[in-house]
A protein has these predicted regions:
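Helix-start (N-cap) detector for alpha-helical repeat units in TPR-like alpha-solenoids
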Residues: 30, 64-65, 98-99, 132-133, ...
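Structural marker of alpha-solenoid helical repeat scaffolds
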Residues: 59, 93, 127, 161, ...
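Position-specific recognition of the canonical hydrophobic site in helix A of tetratricopeptide repeat
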Residues: 41, 68, 75, 92, ...
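TPR/TPR-like (Sel1-like) alpha-helical repeat modules
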Residues: 156-162, 170-178, 190-191, 267, ...
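Canonical tetratricopeptide repeat
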Residues: 69, 103, 137, 171, ...
């Protein structure tokens, strides 16, 4: 995590207080010590400033602000234990003093003593509610103890105070992703046979273009007693991508039969019309969805366009432009399909509602049935904390579908708090947290566009989520700022490889290795690229050179070496390498590979055991990393 860097400005305010207000009758020697401390501090000489403060504390041990400033100098020079001692002494003299509480909490966060940090950071936040750093530190402490929801609340408060702080946006985005993982664990443990879990699994497969697996998961979800609204429509989109248009039409119409206001089904029919060359009919459906709820279409226009042939998109654009010129459709409708940034739309994007209106609330169900999701959300959101479960379900649905993911997330939290609606609540919390994470991380990137480190961190997160184009974009931003950054080159090569751009990945890895021929991580990625190109003989040397890589990459390198040996008929060596990778098998494919090798040498008992473990890991694999697993190394093309 990136270190909070506000100590100098806080110190300065205390020095001014000491010099100008608190102790006007001090001897000249004492005043000189404080002035010297301030001067050293202003020029960044924290060692010297600390020595002056130490002498001042010796002269006046009863002044808590002096001890606080001494602690800050220790903090700035990395003397953590001395800083903690000084802050504690200041707090004993004046328990509510803001600075020592804040920085003692920050020190404990830095040392991963999160439970000790929380009370100090809470006290700092209470004594100075407008300080973003107190809320940011508190969020980090809550995240450290695994209380992701409280962490998110603290980050949101920090964001309200300082919306231009890239650190806050970054931590908020990461916290949302951690909430997704936490929800996945609960869903897997308590609700693995729920229609909401199967629908979530299907949604994830669909996002990864694993349409065969998505179809199976949607069918399973639809066979259960309850499942999310629009599941038939979502299944229809998968069938469109598999070019089964008649079955897709059946699913869209089935959705409309039970859910007449489904804009997702309407959008699906628009996609069907376009696939069949019925452009005017497609535009009518799109215009109808936009009229009902612009926020819905803004959130789903990219989904509508995904996988469409370029010529069909061109024809759609032509007809939309003609209708816009004639006044038949609004200007913003065309903008949605041209990827115009939201800040250039003329219609107002949905926001979290505030004012209560009981007459609107009574009409929420009617709004939903008409596809007016934003109006439905606005009607219910002001009473979120008092709504009964039936209305919470409706609010979560309407808020998410209208693109108001902040409200959807808060509503889902309430649903998840009850055992009767936990699975449904976690479904909506996961869906909305994914969207919120993407938005927060993108905002962090915009605000701190000059930081290669942040772009690399964002690239890593996108790559882990299998959002490879976004990952590539972040790595390239980092390389624009620092062309020889090894971390960016490493991440970019992996993202390109995972996205099927093997030649470009090879080009990037080769360029990186020219400057860093002995870098173990770059050698590892070069070995992986050559494995993907079936150049196992070429890969072997690079992989052996990468065996002194970071511990977190160690199992993966052994798994790749195992693959090299297996493909070059060195079965025993392959088994030995794969054994070293088994402990890190998150999706079951390494156990599957070693099981096949055991069969090859006639060891059926070991093979059966490895197959059993592979199956168990697969069944448990709800997280994004596990969802992508197939009985080979990658999802098969579909």
């Amino acid at each position: 995590m990136r270190r909070i860097g506000t100590a100098p400005s806080v110190c300065y305010s205390i020095v001014c207080f000491l010099l100008g207000v608190a102790y006007p009758q001090q001897p000249p020697e004492f005043e000189s010590l404080l002035a010297s401390a301030q001067q050293a501090q202003a020029r960044g000489d924290f060692e010297a400033a600390g020595e002056f403060y130490r002498k001042a504390v010796a002269a006046h041990p009863e002044i808590p602000e002096l001890k606080a400033n001494l602690g800050l100098m220790y903090y700035q020079t990395g003397k953590d234990q001395k800083a903690i001692e000084a802050f504690n002494l200041a707090i004993r003299l004046k328990p509510d003093l803001f600075v020592p509480n804040l920085f003692l909490g920050i020190e404990y966060v830095k040392l991963k003593r999160f439970n000790k940090a929380i009370p100090y950071l809470k006290r700092a936040a209470q004594s100075k509610p407008t300080d973003a750093q107190a809320q940011l530190g508190l969020g980090q402490a809550y995240a450290g103890i695994g209380n992701t929801r409280l962490a998110i609340r603290s980050y949101l408060r920090a964001n309200d105070i300082d919306p231009q702080n890239a650190d806050v946006w970054y931590h908020l985005g990461v916290a949302y992703l951690e909430q997704v993982e936490a929800d996945a664990r609960v869903l897997l443990t308590r609700h693995k046979d729920s229609g909401f879990v199967q629908a979530l699994l299907a949604d994830t497969f669909a996002e990864q273009h694993a349409f065969l697996q998505a179809a199976d998961a949607y069918k399973k979800a639809l066979s259960l007693d309850s499942f999310p609204p629009d599941t038939h429509a979502n299944y229809g989109f998968v069938l469109v991508n598999r070019h089964d248009l008649s079955s897709a039409e059946h699913e869209f119409n089935t959705e409309l039969a039970s859910n007449p206001g489904s804009l997702m089904a309407m959008l699906g029919l628009a996609r069907l019309h376009l696939e069949r060359g019925e452009v005017e009919e497609s535009v009518k459906e799109i215009a109808g969805a936009f009229k009902a709820d612009p926020g819905f279409l803004a959130s789903n226009a990219s989904r509508f366009s995904a996988g469409l042939a370029p010529e069909k998109l061109t024809e759609l654009d032509r007809v939309l432009e003609q209708r816009q010129t004639s006044g038949a459709t609004p200007e913003d409708l065309l903008a949605l399909f041209r990827n115009v940034p939201p800040n250039q739309w003329s219609f107002e994007a949905p926001k979290m509602a505030t004012g209560a209106d009981k007459s609107l609330a009574s009409n929420a169900t009617g709004f939903y049935k008409d596809g007016n999701y934003t109006q439905c959300s606005d009607a219910l959101a002001p009473r979120l904390e008092t709504l009964p479960p039936k209305d919470l379900r409706l609010l979560a649905t309407c808020a998410y579908l209208s693109g108001n993911t902040r409200t959807a997330f808060e509503t889902a939290r309430r649903l998840a708090a009850s055992s009767a609606t936990e699975a449904e609540g976690l479904y909506w919390e996961t869906k909305s947290a994914e969207q919120l994470a993407t938005g927060a991380l993108a905002r962090a990137s915009e605000l701190d566009s000059s930081s290669p480190k942040l772009h690399i961190l964002l690239g890593d997160i996108y790559r882990q989520r299998k959002s490879f184009p976004e990952a590539e974009q972040e790595y390239r931003k980092a390389l624009t700022l620092k062309s020889d950054d090894t971390g960016a080159l490493f991440g970019l090569s992996l993202a390109l490889l995972a996205d099927g751009q093997t030649d470009e990945a090879l080009h990037q890895a080769q360029a990186a290795l020219e400057n860093n021929p002995d870098d173990p991580e770059l050698n590892a990625v070069m070995g992986e690229i050559l494995c993907a190109r079936s150049d196992f003989a070429g890969a072997e040397g690079y992989l052996k050179k990468s065996l002194n890589t970071k511990p977190e990459y160690f199992p993966h390198v052994h798994a790749l070496l195992g693959k090299v040996y297996a493909q070059t008929n060195r079965t025993q060596e392959a088994i030995a390498e794969l054994r070293l990778a088994l402990a890190d098998d998150k999706d079951g494919h390494i156990h599957y590979q070693i099981a096949r090798l055991y069969l090859k040498i006639g060891d059926r008992d070991s093979a059966r055991q490895a197959f059993d473990v592979s199956d168990r890991i697969r069944r448990q694999g709800l997280t994004r990393a596990a969802v992508a697993m197939q009985q080979g190394d990658e999802i098969e093309p579909q």
